[in-house]
């Protein structure tokens, strides 16, 4: 069962109106105070700030739910975890990725196991081993890894693939000893 609740936006939306008023007052004050000084700078500065917001939103597309800001440089898992990052929004991408690579089985323990029952196209799923990567495909939910350190081996290996913003994947050929990096 998946959830359509967006906990981050749900709690922030009520303050947007107040922030917009404050930003408008600030912009008007800035324009008034700089009317005699730096006249060539004030309008480009305001359009630059507005453009920054537009570009920031466009770069986050379509991952608005897991977007944080430019400081994270696309690695929000280094700053936030749990429901701040993963609401199951990338589960369809995980299923599509596994189908694309022809996986028939995957070692995977999602942050919320009910995500597997939400109708996503997955091959056979076996629980991840905490100590060792399994032969074949391994997928790690960043939310589960950051909150529960499960699986423990994930932090010792650079991911081979990033699926959306909330999952990592590796492939280890049968008989191959996964290397610690």
Where are these regions (language model features)?
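Transmembrane-helix signature of polytopic, lipid-linked glycan biosynthesis machinery
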Residues: 1-8, 58-61
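Conserved short-loop catalytic and cofactor-binding motifs
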Residues: 2, 11, 82
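Hydrophobic/aromatic-rich transmembrane helices and adjacent perimembrane loops
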Residues: 5-30, 170
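Alpha-helix capping/termination and helix-coil
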Residues: 18-22, 31-34, 52, 98, ...
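Signature aromatic-anchored transmembrane alpha helix within multi-pass, membrane-resident enzymes
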Residues: 26-63
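Helicase-core coupling region on the C-terminal RecA-like lobe
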Residues: 57-75
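C-terminal luminal/periplasmic domains and tails of membrane-associated envelope-modifying transferases
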Residues: 69-181
């Amino acid at each position: 069962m998946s959830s359509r609740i967006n906990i981050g936006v749900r709690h922030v939306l009520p303050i947007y109106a107040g922030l917009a008023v404050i930003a408008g007052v600030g912009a008007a004050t800035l324009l008034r105070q700089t009317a005699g000084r730096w006249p060539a700078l004030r309008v480009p500065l305001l359009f630059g700030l507005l453009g920054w917001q537009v570009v920031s939103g466009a770069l986050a597309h379509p991952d608005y739910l897991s977007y944080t800001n430019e400081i994270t440089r696309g690695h929000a898992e280094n700053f936030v975890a749990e429901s701040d990052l993963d609401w199951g929004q990338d589960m369809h991408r995980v299923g599509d990725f596994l189908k694309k690579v022809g996986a028939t089985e995957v070692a995977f323990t999602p942050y919320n196991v009910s995500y597997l029952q939400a109708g996503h196209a997955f091959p056979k799923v076996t629980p991840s081993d905490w100590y060792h990567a399994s032969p074949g495909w391994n997928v790690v939910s960043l939310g589960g890894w950051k909150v529960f350190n499960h699986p423990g081996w994930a932090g010792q290996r650079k991911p081979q693939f990033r699926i959306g913003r909330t999952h990592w994947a590796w492939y280890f050929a049968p008989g191959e000893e996964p290397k610690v990096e």
